[in-house]
């Protein structure tokens, strides 16, 4: 493992200095490589002391020491607010604590509103798109969240409006995105806002994203989990739960595959080609690009997994794309276990010198 402070400037002037809430806000948000703090304030039933103990300052110290420069921090509505929109004091205290730790370590934060009561990307019913009142509530959540954390400078903290929107029509997301962005701009004109396209922030749908005009404080984001046979190898929540074949990367993804999907060949060139849409949009608009999620399940074959991660990082570095792997600790995709024992090969691959 190693320490690396090299940054790709995502907006205006880069800064490696530590920041604190009372510093004047800038419009720079400089990141290169980070990790997702999943299953803490999002997608978790942990509460009380168990939740508080899951992610601590020791984690931030480790993240900084191995060369990451930021975290992406998913939060869920159900953890942060009750059904009437009242804040959960414990959850907001943990959030504030994490921001302080990151500031003290010189780390940046992408604060991601991950799951709403009205929108979970894998759910069949998503009232966010069918009930206007839910969209009003969504805007109110951002107003309250902004009020809670806006003291942190724009050079240290960015807002990701919503994780992996899934609407029947991409215009439903584009319209809500425009409304949310306009609202946030009335409170925080210089805050960096992270946005992605409809249908899971997929690279393949990026040309359907309507990006706010004349706003340079935008960070474009996509997620990448291809080839699925490798990244979600035998994942219990997917169609591959009972898959018994042998996966292979680079090359034909399933050894002795019998379907076109299983016989498809993946390598660094094919992966980069799949990212063409977001790369092209970012270049055309002169905006920075971020892969906010990518990863391979822990149970996948190690050699293939490391080869994939190595190729992904090479593509990101070639194209000036910042990135955050999914995810940091435990779960199905972690790069460290619950006792902070790292997968050294994985960490080194994600943080090359």
Outline where the language-model segments fall.
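Active-site region of glycoside hydrolase catalytic domains
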Residues: 132-265, 272-297, 318-321
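C-terminal motif of bacterial Sec signal peptides marking the signal peptidase cleavage site
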Residues: 14-15
